[in-house]
Curated annotation (Swiss-Prot):
Pathway membership: Glycan degradation; glycogen degradation
E.C. number(s) listed in UniProt: 3.2.1.196
Protein name: Glycogen debranching enzyme
Annotated site (Transition state stabilizer): D443
Stated family: Belongs to the glycosyl hydrolase 13 family.
HAMAP family tied to this protein: GlgX
Keywords: Carbohydrate metabolism, Glycogen metabolism, Glycosidase, Hydrolase
Gene: glgX
Pfam families: Alpha-amylase (PF00128), CBM_48 (PF02922), GlgX_C (PF18390)
Length: 657
């Protein structure tokens, strides 16, 4: 039988060099590591990794070829109280595997034991890693590098975006290929999108609890192989990487960036009763934050928390991010529960992973977006990330909804959020684009549901409606649920228009949730993470063409307003913004705090947003000059020229002079 050569300790993972494959695995506490290779008949062949350089185990298998299936058995102590859970009876996934063969099904053999080890061998049913060869012709691909000030983000799910699209070929709907189809690209271009932000595409597993209920993890925030593409989104698992890169290349040719939502805060191994796939059996003590009793710190709400202050885990995370940029040409990342990235265990701006990203010539040049919180004490870190990062701005989301749907936000607070939340983000040299403004996201109500439901309706999730937030700041306008009288439909439409206008014409980087421009509803489910069905898939046949056109017109209007695209903080007297009352006069201190919800925002001295967020029709006296309403508030050929605007209740309009 072929013996392993010593090989090299870098790079991590399995790499084919034309003559054989080099295998490397980190484990600081292992006593022995076996490489397990499976032939075409499923027969297992085991080899001890002979090289041991520091904490890296390595070996070289001559004559091995791409397509080889493999895994690891890692020997070491079973000492749960000290955080060690080695169990060589269990076949483990290479954390750096580029492709996985097999499914992550709920099976007792995929558990290693809680207090005592489960020594039943699981190789027959455990997923296997696959050695891949990386040859791809990028042609003349180049990153669009859209300036932050011109960026419009569109958050979408690979499957949900295209699965029901009637103009995309049936055989590729819901796949990576569909993202690069001309129909999809033309739609994004016409809408005005500059960056497509995809929910997780790294391979993930459905939690055992969901599988037992007949559900699945739809969103993908349960990662199991961070270097491997999720095969369910590919026409063929073997060609997933090729399909994904084809889509990115096509999007780049259209000037559209691709941002990946990535989960570096926990793994699909969940809590100590969860399955054993990889990290727990390779080096539990190093990869996870471990409590003094040997259990996990659950700062993510998912059972475990990756220890991104450990040098080897920092190297792993950095290598993962570089892989997606260098191999797949992605343009940036949105980091889920990103406060975990800065834990040491307290949150620090100079945490090891932040420092590694800052010092990396590759990662420091791409777009970095943080979801700036986790669920641990001190986990809410909005505004506190290093200067390279932009951050989801939940202050904006809540303020916009409160102002237009709950009517309880003072003008001053609204204006502060409209001006890129400078009280939060104007520090350490950061620019307005650091505020990622959103009204909705995958997590929560859709925009239509914000105006149709007062309460969440998550019964389909199997948790008796306990899951999902109760703080939605929504308003059903008098009737729970979609549909209703013409008057009700019109009032809801006006609220949607007001929220979209606030989002797309405010300072900061706007993020639009896919489907909001259609009027997509999830029928009140504000936590649809386990709904891989028509509740979440965008129904293009039911899309509101009028709302889509309204959204596109707002985006194109935004691109014409210098105050919004120049990415400079507004200063008193700089000509970027003036705040006026209904009489076109500067607001008094009392009006800012206690005045009626009527406001005029003059941008770049030419564009005027007139707002009447009161219950009554109100005359708004426009500033001096000849003003005409502009699309999408008036037609191109018949602009409304006026000096006084009769502002409808809960209405707004944009003028130009």
């Amino acid at each position: 039988m072929t013996q392993l050569a010593i090989g090299k300790p870098a790079p991590l993972g399995a790499h084919y060099d034309g003559q054989g494959v080099n295998f490397t695995l980190f484990s600081a506490h292992a006593e022995r590591v076996e490489l397990c290779v499976f032939d075409a008949n499923g027969q297992e062949h085991r080899y001890d990794l002979p090289g041991h350089s520091g904490d890296i185990w390595h070996g070289y298998l001559p004559d091995a070829r791409p397509g080889l299936r493999y895994g690891y058995r890692v020997h070491g102590p079973w000492q749960p109280a000290e955080g060690h859970r080695f169990n060589p009876a269990k076949l483990l996934i290479d954390p750096c595997a580029r492709q996985i063969d097999g499914e992550f099904k709920d099976n007792p053999l995929l558990h290693a034991g809680h207090n005592e080890p489960d020594y039943r061998d699981n190789a027959a049913i455990a997923p296997k890693c696959v050695v891949v060869v990386d040859h791809y012709d990028w042609e003349d691909d180049a990153p669009p590098r859209t300036p932050w000030g011109s960026t419009i983000i569109y958050e979408a799910h690979v499957k949900g975006l295209t699965y029901l699209h009637p103009e995309i070929p049936v055989e590729i709907r819901g796949t990576y290929k569909a993202l690069g189809h001309p129909v999809m690209i033309n739609y994004l271009k016409q809408l005005g999108i500059t960056a497509l932000e995809l929910l997780p595409v790294a391979q993930f597993a459905s939690e055992p609890r969901l599988q037992r209920m007949g559900l699945s993890n739809y969103w993908g925030y349960n990662p199991v192989a961070m270097f491997a593409l999720h095969p369910a989104y590919a026409c063929s698992p073997e060609t997933a990487l090729h399909e994904f890169r084809d889509a990115i290349k096509a999007l780049h040719k259209a000037g559209i960036e691709v941002i990946l939502d990535i989960v570096l805060n926990h793994s699909a191994e969940l809590d100590l009763d969860g399955p054993l796939f990889s990290l727990r059996g390779i080096d539990n003590r190093s990869y996870y934050w471990i409590r003094e009793d040997g259990d996990y710190h659950n700062w993510t709400g998912c059972g475990n928390t990756l220890n991104l202050s450990h040098p080897a885990v920092v190297d792993y995370a950095s290598a993962c991010l570089r892989y997606w940029v260098e191999t797949c040409h992605v343009d940036g990342f949105r980091f889920d529960l990103a406060a975990v990235m800065g834990r040491t265990p307290e949150f620090r701006q100079d945490a090891p992973l932040f420092t590694a990203i800052q010092n990396c010539p590759v990662l420091s040049q791409v777009k970095l977006i943080a979801e700036p919180w986790d669920i641990a004490p001190g986990g809410y870190q909005v505004g506190n990330f290093p200067p390279l990062f932009a951050e989801w701005n939940d202050h904006f989301r809540d303020a916009a909804r409160r102002f237009w749907l709950h009517y309880d936000l003072p003008l001053g607070a609204f204006a502060g959020r409209f001006a890129a939340s400078s009280d939060v983000f104007k520090r350490n040299g950061r620019l307005p684009s650091a505020a990622i403004n959103l009204v909705t996201a995958h997590d929560g109500f859709t925009l239509r549901d914000c105006v149709c439901f007062n309460h969440k309706h998550n019964e389909a999730n199997g948790e008796e409606n306990r899951d999902g937030t109760n703080n939605n700041y929504s308003n059903n306008h008098g009737k729970e649920g979609v549909g209703g009288t013409l008057d009700l439909v019109e009032r809801r439409r006006d609220s949607i228009h007001a929220l979209l206008t606030t989002l797309l014409l405010s300072q900061g980087t706007p993020m639009l949730l896919a489907g909001d421009e259609h009027g997509h509803s999830q029928h009140g489910n504000n936590n649809a993470y386990c709904q891989d069905n028509q509740l979440t898939w965008l129904d293009w046949s039911q899309a509101s063409s009028g709302l889509t056109a309204f959204t596109a017109a707002l985006i194109h209007l935004r691109k014409r307003i210098p105050a919004l695209v120049e990415n400079r903080w507004w200063e008193e007297g700089d000509g970027n913004v003036r705040w006026l009352n209904r009489y076109a006069q500067p607001l008094s201190t009392d009006e800012w705090q206690n005045g009626p919800k009527q406001l005029q925002i003059l941008l770049s001295d030419r564009f005027l947003i007139a707002i009447n967020a009161t219950l009554e029709v109100t005359e708004i006296v426009l500033p001096a000059g000849e003003w005409h309403a502009i699309p999408p508030f008036a037609g191109e050929d018949n602009p409304v020229i006026t000096a006084v605007w009769q502002g409808p209740a809960h209405g707004l309009c944009v003028f130009q002079r």
